[in-house]
Amino acid sequence: YLHLKGIDLDEAIEKEVRNYYSKGLPDRMPPVDLVMILQRVLMQFGDGHADVRSTNFRLGEGEPFNPFLLGDTDGKVVAFRSDRSDLLDPKYPFVVSLDGRPIEVCIEEWIPFISAGSPQLIRRRAVGLLREVSMWRRIDGGGGFRDIERKMHRPFAVELVSKDGKKTRTLELKPTDRKPTYREWPRSESR
């Protein structure tokens, strides 16, 4: 795929390194940063089966998680319970923001981490990645790894909007270490 797409690997890696580190590679970097850099480069090749894995990190697999799932329908993001039994809030089904960050901004940030495909597939995969809190929560300031982990587990706000788009509601939720999974929907017994 590298040669089919005409990608200059060295240039692609250098560009992604500059996205993370404006002064070039540091002497030491967290493994997650290396995984993110390599994942973005690899996704440019367009191989949907390619992935970067580390014993410390795998994209979309790190705790903590949202205590709900997200889905895309007609260009809107809907929130539903982690067991998929109902919407998170049936009167306010659509997500406006996560932790004060617009949901569309959260989605757009993760598109480069997904291999080339149809716009619908890319969006669906990006929305799915948002179940991992670290995919949308930003940590400002210094601190070590333990400090970042502690901050990742803080409660967060989910702003929802009604079907007609006229009313909003904000829920304060706590991240969970239990990964919600996307299964068959609707459940087979409801067909």
Label the model's feature ranges.
Residues 1-191:
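Flexible, low-complexity junctional segments that flank or bridge functional domains
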